[in-house]
Amino acid sequence: MNIYFCGSIRGGRQDVVIYQTIVKKLQQYGNVLTEHVSYDSLSDKGEDKDGDKAIHDRDVQWLTMSDVIVAEVTQPSLGVGYELGRAVAMNKRILCLFRPFSGKVLSAMIRGASAKPLFQVQDYKEDEVENILEEYFETLTKN
């Protein structure tokens, strides 16, 4: 299974430790095409060696190849929002993870999209994320 993980890069790297936990867990279920999002070495300046167009085209190709999208959406990010919009247009299965106790409010464009059958938003606390992913992928493999 190809898994596309979305997390903030240029929007801020405050949640990189959570991204690492999520990606490590996701690797139990398949190939995480975007594991680099969880790297400590990736700054909020992002990747720059190949340029923005190359990054965009590569990431859209990975989205196309993906069986499921998992996004940590607590840290607002234009890029993550764009990726989610493209994934919805491709009819991909999407799980968005949000920490309401962060003091942030999730965009209505994300929370409101969860009325679609393939789009799910799950509120969580950090110590719950691995169990949430286990439950999601158990259900996914049964269907």
Curated annotation (Swiss-Prot):
EC number(s) recorded for this UniProt protein: 3.2.2.-
Cellular component aspect of the GO annotation: cytoplasm; nucleus
Positions annotated to bind 5-hydroxymethyl-dUMP: G7, I9, R10, G11, S77, G79, E83, S107
Keyword presence, Hydrolase: yes
Pfam families linked: Nuc_deoxyrib_tr (PF05014)
Subunit structure comment from the entry: Monomer and homodimer.
GO molecular function, one term: 5-hydroxymethyl-dUMP N-hydrolase activity
Keywords, in A-Z order: Cytoplasm, Glycosidase, Hydrolase, Nucleotide metabolism, Nucleus, Phosphoprotein
Cellular localization per UniProt: Cytoplasm; Nucleus
Similarity section: Belongs to the 2'-deoxynucleoside 5'-phosphate N-hydrolase 1 family.
Coiled coil: none
Biological process (GO), any one: positive regulation of cell growth
Catalyzed reaction equations: 5-hydroxymethyl-dUMP + H2O = 5-hydroxymethyluracil + 2-deoxy-D-ribose 5-phosphate
Signal peptide range: none
Annotated protein name in UniProt: 5-hydroxymethyl-dUMP N-hydrolase
Keyword Magnesium among record annotations: no
InterPro entries in alphabetical order: 2'-dNMP_N-hydrolase, DNPH1, Nucleoside_deoxyribTrfase
The protein's role, per its UniProt record: Part of a nucleotide salvage pathway that eliminates epigenetically modified 5-hydroxymethyl-dCMP (hmdCMP) in a two-step process entailing deamination to cytotoxic 5-hydroxymethyl-dUMP (hmdUMP), followed by its hydrolysis into 5-hydroxymethyluracil (hmU) and 2-deoxy-D-ribose 5-phosphate (deoxyribosephosphate).
Bilayer-spanning residue ranges: none
